[in-house]
């Protein structure tokens, strides 16, 4: 887990390299003199202390938490578009191809407090964990039973009939 204040070119290039290395980046973009930004920045800085206390496993190893002033946006090569307003909190992963704003996330609590930020970060890390598994949806039991293995349609049904279907002989019944 890394916390970065993007105030010089070295730190900005370090963040660009972190995105290229497929790290999960949580970025706060603020503007000097902005009232909501002034209120949000101290809450964002508390994330460091809270997450350092929670690092009991490998959950946060691939995480970078950064903050930058709006003037540095042109130097950030991975940003697709400029923020709609300030402050703007972004989640960036998959080498910059996945970008989501805090306001567009599925978290219930969207207030700019430490609790809502931690909830957002944890929800993104859980979602990332489950994305690597099965692709596509599960077949329902009704659909599986409707497949005619004497005349399967398509590659998936053929493979299901060949490898996945349990015949009545192989099924176990629980009493």
Where are these regions (language model features)?
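Eukaryotic short linear interaction motifs
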Residues: 35-36, 73-75, 97-99
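Local sequence-structure signature of Cys/Sec-based thiol-disulfide redox active-site neighborhoods
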Residues: 13-53
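A short glycine-leucine-enriched loop at secondary-structure breakpoints
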Residues: 78-84
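Arg/Lys-rich, intrinsically disordered low-complexity tails that mediate electrostatic binding
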Residues: 131-175
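Thiol-based oxidoreductase modules, predominantly thioredoxin-like and allied folds used
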Residues: 3-10, 29, 41, 48, ...
């Amino acid at each position: 887990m890394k916390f970065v204040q993007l105030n010089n070119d070295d730190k900005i290039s370090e963040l660009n390299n972190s995105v290229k290395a497929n790290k999960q980046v949580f970025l706060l973009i603020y503007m000097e003199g902005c009232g909501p930004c002034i209120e949000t920045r101290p809450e964002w800085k508390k994330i460091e202390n809270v997450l350092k206390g929670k690092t009991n496993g490998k959950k946060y190893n691939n995480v970078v938490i950064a903050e930058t002033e709006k003037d540095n946006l042109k130097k950030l090569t991975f940003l697709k578009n400029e923020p709609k307003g300030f402050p703007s909190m972004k989640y960036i992963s998959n080498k910059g191809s996945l970008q989501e704003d805090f306001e567009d996330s599925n978290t219930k609590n969207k207030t700019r407090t430490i609790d809502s930020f931690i909830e957002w970060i944890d929800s993104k890390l859980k979602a990332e964990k489950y994305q690597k598994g099965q692709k596509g949806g599960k077949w329902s039991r009704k659909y599986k039973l409707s497949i005619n293995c004497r005349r399967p349609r398509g590659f998936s049904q053929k493979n299901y009939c060949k490898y996945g279907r349990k015949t009545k002989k192989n099924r176990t019944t629980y009493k």
